Amino acid sequence: MAGHSKWANIQHRKGRQDEKRGKIWTRIIREIVVAARAGGGDTAMNPRLRLAIDKAKAANMPADRIKYNVDKATGNQEGVSYEEIRYEGYGIGGAAIIIDTMTDNRVRTVAEVRHAFSKYGGNLGTDGSVSFQFKHCGQFMFAPGSSEDRIMEVALDAGAEDVVTDDDGTVEVLCAPPDFEAVQAALQAAGLVPELAEVTMRAENTVALDGEDAQRMQKLLDVLEDLDDTQAVFHNAELDE
């Protein structure tokens, strides 16, 4: 296992999010608009919208702004139409990268993604070129030192598929995407608060990178995450500190 722990990865991500809070709001608004447009504005009937609104609340987005964007998506306000597009490619050392985007201009988006790969040492691939290396799942991450036994008891009873303790002590709960809300509710009811809770693409295997290669890979990932149309970036690199 490379020296860059999962806990360090989480802290890096949270630090990046704190630096660009405005961009986080923009991404969440896109998620709300797309979810509401696809499944309607009733959160009781639209789990994707529920999750997007939960993200908005966690990011301290005002309730009136959330409501405005739900209304915009469901026809009560005029708005932009977004398209969801996934790009796949290779980073340093052949590490796999997935970029999920929402865009109102796919020509602009693919040009920006391709430019980022080309400039920072990667290659944009074709549909399906790397996604088979990932599993779509719900993921909850608890800090090193958390009670693994208690987390395991609550999570498995709620329908989680697995609970894993990583080398650095991080406790990771995995579940099928449809079970995400049930597992999350059970953990919250038990007073177990994860540092990270999301439906994600989890790498099945990793590529270890260190030194200059790790730095170059981190730069590529940061540039891809900073693109205006990017919603999420997933990868299978283990970056050595």
Curated annotation (Swiss-Prot):
<dbReference type="GO" id="GO:0003677">
    <property type="term" value="F:DNA binding"/>
</dbReference>
<comment type="similarity">
    <text>Belongs to the TACO1 family.</text>
</comment>
<dbReference type="Pfam" id="PF20772">
    <property type="entry name" value="TACO1_YebC_N"/>
</dbReference>
<dbReference type="InterPro" id="IPR026564">
    <property type="entry name" value="Transcrip_reg_TACO1-like_dom3"/>
</dbReference>
<dbReference type="InterPro" id="IPR029072">
    <property type="entry name" value="YebC-like"/>
</dbReference>
<dbReference type="GO" id="GO:0005829">
    <property type="term" value="C:cytosol"/>
</dbReference>
<feature type="region of interest" description="Disordered">
    <location>
        <begin position="1"/>
        <end position="20"/>
    </location>
</feature>
<dbReference type="InterPro" id="IPR049083">
    <property type="entry name" value="TACO1_YebC_N"/>
</dbReference>
<dbReference type="InterPro" id="IPR048300">
    <property type="entry name" value="TACO1_YebC-like_2nd/3rd_dom"/>
</dbReference>
<dbReference type="InterPro" id="IPR002876">
    <property type="entry name" value="Transcrip_reg_TACO1-like"/>
</dbReference>
<keyword id="KW-0963">Cytoplasm</keyword>
<keyword id="KW-0238">DNA-binding</keyword>
<dbReference type="GO" id="GO:0006355">
    <property type="term" value="P:regulation of DNA-templated transcription"/>
</dbReference>
<dbReference type="InterPro" id="IPR017856">
    <property type="entry name" value="Integrase-like_N"/>
</dbReference>
<protein>
    <recommendedName>
        <fullName>Probable transcriptional regulatory protein Mpe_A1337</fullName>
    </recommendedName>
</protein>
<keyword id="KW-0805">Transcription regulation</keyword>
<dbReference type="Pfam" id="PF01709">
    <property type="entry name" value="Transcrip_reg"/>
</dbReference>
<keyword id="KW-0804">Transcription</keyword>
